[in-house]
Amino acid sequence: MAKKQKKSTEKSERTVEFKEPPKPANSEERLKPAGRGMKPSPSQNTLNRMERETIVFWRRPHIVIPYALMEIAHLAVELFFKILAHKTVLLLTAISIGLAVYGYHAPGAHQEHVQTIEKHILWWSWWVLLGVLSSIGLGSGLHTFLIYLGPHIAAVTMAAYECQSLDFPQPPYPESIQCPSTKSSIAVTFWQIVAKVRVESLLWGAGTALGELPPYFMARAARISGQEPDDEEYREFLELMNADKESDADQKLSIVERAKSWVEHNIHRLGFPGILLFASIPNPLFDLAGITCGHFLVPFWSFFGATLIGKALVKMHVQMGFVILAFSDHHAENFVKILEKIPAVGPYIRQPISDLLEKQRKALHKTPGEHSEQSTSYLAWGLSLMVTFMILFFFLSIVNSLAKDYHKRLWERKRRQNKDLIDEENQSFEEEEEEAVTPPSSCPLLLSDGFEGVVVKK
C-alpha cells in the first residue's frame, strides 16, 4: 500500500513544460499579421475632394472649360438676384451711375478735370488690383511685385539718375518714361525718388492687405461653424497645427515649419503688435496671415488694421528702399561688373545685360516724335516670355478654380438630393410601421381579460 501511495504522489507531482520554439535572429516581439490587413475606407467627401484635385486644364480640358463657363453663369445669376434683393441701394446706384455717365460725356469746361480724375482712378485701381492678385494668387503663387511694381520702381530710379530730374513729361508718364527737355539744377536724392513712387507702392500694399480678407472670413466662419471648408491652404494650416501637437513633432517638422507653427500658435496672444510686427517684415513665417487670424478668431479691426499698416506703410517702404538702392546711380554697372567675374559664364551674362541697360538709356532721351529702335535683345525677349507665361498660368489657375467651384456645387446639389430622398424614405417607412400595428383582436388568448396564465404539469 505504501508503494502504491508513493507512486500516486509521484504521478500527481509531475508537471508538463511547454517550450517556445526558438526565435530567429533580429525578430520582433510580435509576429507581423499575415495578409494585407484592413485599411480604412475614405469618406465620400474625401473621394470628392480627390476627384476635384484632378480637374485641371492640362489634364481634363474638356471638363474644365464647360465647368468654368457654367460657374461664371451661376455667379452672374446669383449676383443679379442679390442686387434685386436690395432695391433701394440698386435705385441709388443706378441714379449715381446715370449722373456720372452724363457728366462724363457732357461737353464743357469740366472735361479737363474729368479726364484727370479718370486717369488717376484707373491708375490707382490698377495697382490695388495687382496687390489683391499678389495676395490671393488663386493657387498660382503670382507675386506682382516682381512682375510690375519692382520693375516700375527700378525704371523710375534709373531714369531719375540718368535724366537728373523727376519731372517726367505727362503724357507719356506713367505709361512710359522720357527725360524732360530741361535738367533740374537740384541733385536727385533718395527721398525724392521715394516720394515719386510712394502712391503706387502704398496702393499695392493696401491691395495685399485687402487680399487677406477672403481667407480670414473663410477661416473664421469654419472655426465658428465647426465645418472644414474645401480649401487647400486651410487644410495645410490644420495639418501643420495637428502635426505640432504630436510627440515626435520635432523629428517630423523642419526648423522652418516649427517656427511657422510657433508663430501661428501664438499670433492670437500677441494681438495687434504681433500682427503688425510679422506683417511689416518680409518673411515666409506669416504667409497664412488671414487664415491664422481667422482660425483663432482675432477681432477684425485688430487683424485688418495691423495688416494694412504693416504691409502698406512699413513693409512697402522697406521693399521700396531696397529696389531704389539696388538700381541707384552706378549700382547697376557695379552689379554687371560683379557678374562678369563669374567663371565660365560671366562674359556671356554681362553682354546682354549691358545692351539692355544701354537701350534703356537711349529710350529715355528720345523725343516724342522720334522713331525708336525696334530690335530686342535675347534677355529682354526672355524676360517678356517669362512674364507672359506667368500671366498665362495665372489665367489658367483662375479657370481651374472656377471649374472646381462648379464641381463642388454639383456635389453639394447631389448630396442635398440624396438627403431629401433618404428623408422621404424614412418618413414613408415610419408611416408604414404605424399602419402595420397588430390589432388586439388578432391574439385573443394572450390579450383577453380572463387569461391568468399557463399551468405546466410534469
Curated annotation (Swiss-Prot):
GO cellular component terms, A-Z: cytoplasm; endomembrane system; endoplasmic reticulum; membrane
What does the record list as GO biological process?
autophagosome assembly; Golgi organization; macroautophagy; negative regulation of autophagosome assembly
Which chain positions lie within coiled-coil regions? none
Effects seen without this gene? Defective P granule organization and degradation. Early autophagic structures and lgg-1 puncta form an irregular shape and clump together. RNAi-mediated knockdown results in increased lgg-2-positive autophagosomes following fertilization and at later embryonic stages.
Q: Where is the composition biased (Acidic residues)?
A: 422-436
The protein's UniProt keywords, in alphabetical order, are:
Autophagy, Cytoplasm, Membrane, Transmembrane, Transmembrane helix
Show the segment(s) annotated as Disordered: 1-45, 421-445
Q: How does it sit in the membrane?
A: Multi-pass membrane protein
Regions of biased composition (Basic and acidic residues) lie at: 7-32
> Which segments cross the bilayer?
89-109, 121-141, 289-309, 379-399
User: Where is it mainly found?
Assistant: membrane
Q: Where in the cell is it found?
A: Membrane; Cytoplasm
Tissues expressing this chain: Expressed in pharyngeal and body wall muscles and intestine cells.
Q: Which family does it belong to?
A: Belongs to the VMP1 family.
| Protein function | Involved in autophagy. Thought to act in autophagosome and omegasome formation.
This protein is called what? Answer: Ectopic P granules protein 3
State the organism named in the record: Caenorhabditis elegans
Which gene is annotated as encoding this protein in its UniProt record?
epg-3
